[in-house]
């Protein structure tokens, strides 16, 4: 066991990202049943829908699971009360100030993890009293940090300023990547894109198949005047890029985003007008196809073990100094 498996009561230090329109009870329970930590995404659920998913997830697994809550959620008070009322034991917070809710959640016996994109925000999260930190790099899909720091650079930077349990996120889809993050100082990893494209994900099959054919360079980080989002190539990505190049104001960009674009793209599979949020690592998955969560977890665990053995046998030679 390590600090992440001990903190959450799980077998493997692998957390499934709480992704809008992907992370419902089927995905979260499947990840938890496979030995990781499944997360429900409150960001794309009405409060009572979240309550329903919490109950269905609990019925589908006797293992630990949690809820990811964007702190900018418009009905945040109602969402927070629901997770307390439903007995949720683990909450990941993101997109907001962790000082607002951390103490209240911990008073109710909830383990709190906050997602950051820089060492500066990591220090603020630790000061707020969180139990662990997710450091998410530039490679990640969906909402991202303004710093544009890659995971390779971010993890050691965050490790240098905090002793809290640290979870690496962004661009992680293989066992080898997990080992790399461990070498950089992370105690565990959060995997988004790989789980978003599984059978149990609530994303549209059209969206999944589209993302499994993306190539390097097919995703871009846009909407930096608002909240940076990594988007896959398509009409909406082109429209946003053109608007930004033409000097669009924040209000102009909000109008572009105001028609439920993420739901249309991810959940409904509208490749023409929808917002297609996915990570850079999708380009490594072209040969995978849509897999089950169990298959993905087995590949991650086996790949990690094999990478450890390969390094021990062939790579980690001593250098004369």
Predicted regions and their residues:
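Residue-level detector of alpha-helix initiation sites
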Residues: 22, 172-173
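Conserved active-site-proximal phosphate/metal-binding subdomains
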Residues: 145-167, 173-321
């Amino acid at each position: 066991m390590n600090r992440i498996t001990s903190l959450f009561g799980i077998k493997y230090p692998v957390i499934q990202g709480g992704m809008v329109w992907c992370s419902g009870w089927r995905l979260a329970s499947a990840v938890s049943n496979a030995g990781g930590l499944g997360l429900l995404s409150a960001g794309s659920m009405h409060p009572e829908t979240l309550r329903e998913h919490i109950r269905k997830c609990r019925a589908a697994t006797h293992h630990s699971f949690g809820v990811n809550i964007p702190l900018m959620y418009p009905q945040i008070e109602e969402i927070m009360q629901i997770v307390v009322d439903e007995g949720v034991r683990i909450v990941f917070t993101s997109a907001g100030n962790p000082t607002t809710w951390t103490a209240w959640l911990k008073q109710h016996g909830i383990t709190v993890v906050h997602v950051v994109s820089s060492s500066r925000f990591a220090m603020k999260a630790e000061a707020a009293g969180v139990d662990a930190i997710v450091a998410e790099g530039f490679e990640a899909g969906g909402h991202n940090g303004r710093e544009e720091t890659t995971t390779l650079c971010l993890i050691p930077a965050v490790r240098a300023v905090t002793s809290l349990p640290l979870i690496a996120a962004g661009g992680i889809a293989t066992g080898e990547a997990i080992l790399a993050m461990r070498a950089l100082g992370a105690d565990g990893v959060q995997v988004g894109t790989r789980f978003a494209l599984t059978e149990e994900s609530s994303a549209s099959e059209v969206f999944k198949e589209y993302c499994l054919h993306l190539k390097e360079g097919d995703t871009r980080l846009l909407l930096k005047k608002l909240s940076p989002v990594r988007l896959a190539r398509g009409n909406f990505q082109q429209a946003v890029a053109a608007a930004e190049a033409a000097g669009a104001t924040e209000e102009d960009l909000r109008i572009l985003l105001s028609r439920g674009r993420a739901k249309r793209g991810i959940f409904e599979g509208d490749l023409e007008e929808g917002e297609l949020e996915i990570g850079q690592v999708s380009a490594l998955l072209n040969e995978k196809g849509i897999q089950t969560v169990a298959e993905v977890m087995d590949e991650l665990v086996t790949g990690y073990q094999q990478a450890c053995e390969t390094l021990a046998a062939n790579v980690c030679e001593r250098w004369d100094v």
